[in-house]
């Protein structure tokens, strides 16, 4: 197997081959990282996605930021989420895309900059639609 670094792992968990970086951490090394605090977003898009936001809020899911995105202002008003975004308001006038995926896409593209700002810095984003 040419090109594959050869070596052995010592009692401390580190490899003995020069130039290799250990990929596993022991318990004491893990403790130095502290408690992780990831920024997790759950984005519900459209009517179905917004219904999911309501359910997540109702059952009390914690540790995630909930974001509702919709073209229908009335549905968005009745959605429970930490952040709400009405997209395509100049296209649909807040009346919704009527289940038309092409219209929904146009509205999402119109809100691309705002959506990008919302998800920037997130460690993990779940999208439900």
Regions found by a protein language model. Name each.
Residues 1-129:
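Tubulin/FtsZ superfamily GTPase core signature
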